[in-house]
């Protein structure tokens, strides 16, 4: 895969340039564009993933299915599709926005800062997973209600962005729609 970049943003969310992804995530991370995606299977279960230990930010932490950064000229939806193929080896339905105006800043235990405008999407797959071990060290298909209960009871056990997304009432409602079988 070619070197990925992040799209830098000003305080109003307007693009101002790009920076190599690995260089972007530091103790002084600039605001940039990202996305977060929650993936559901044909049984209506959510894919929860554990980030690989080699990840720069939040290694080994349980999180929602896929996160990443759109590249210059790439739509958020196309970026979700690309990262689902790369990290999970799956094809997905068209990603649907569930929390389009999500924005957050969080610092991991190693001092790495995430500072992102991060629209949240949900999608479905019927493909068998082909996990990229450089990205994901473990995974589990779970009932959304169980995951949400776990987040409410033990938020420290999940990535901060997943917790923030899951505790938004409207996002929960939209995610719950993906548990309904089609």
Swiss-Prot record:
GO terms for cellular component: cytoplasm. It catalyses: isopentenyl diphosphate = dimethylallyl diphosphate. Mg(2+) binds at residue 87. The lineage of its organism: Bacteria, Pseudomonadati, Pseudomonadota, Gammaproteobacteria, Enterobacterales. The gene is idi. Belongs to the IPP isomerase type 1 family. GO terms for biological process: dimethylallyl diphosphate biosynthetic process; isoprenoid biosynthetic process. The active site is at 67, 116. This is Isopentenyl-diphosphate Delta-isomerase. It comes from Escherichia coli O7:K1 (strain IAI39 / ExPEC).
């Amino acid at each position: 895969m070619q070197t990925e970049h992040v799209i830098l943003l000003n305080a109003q969310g307007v693009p101002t340039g790009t920076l190599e992804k690995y260089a972007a995530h530091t103790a002084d991370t600039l605001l940039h564009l990202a996305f977060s995606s929650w993936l559901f299977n044909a049984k209506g279960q959510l894919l929860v993933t554990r980030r690989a230990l080699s990840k720069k930010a939040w290694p080994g932490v349980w999180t929602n299915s896929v996160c990443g950064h759109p590249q210059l000229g790439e739509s958020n939806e196309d970026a979700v599709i690309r990262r689902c193929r790369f990290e999970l080896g799956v094809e997905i339905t068209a990603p649907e926005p569930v929390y389009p105006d999500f924005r957050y800043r969080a610092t991991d235990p190693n001092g790495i800062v995430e500072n992102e405008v991060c629209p949240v999407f949900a999608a479905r797959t019927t493909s068998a997973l082909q996990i990229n071990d450089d990205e994901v060290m473990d995974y589990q298909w779970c009932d959304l209600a169980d995951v949400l209960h776990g987040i409410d009871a033990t938020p420290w056990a999940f990535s901060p962005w997943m917790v923030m997304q899951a505790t938004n009432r409207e996002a929960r409602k939209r995610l719950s729609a993906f548990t309904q079988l089609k």
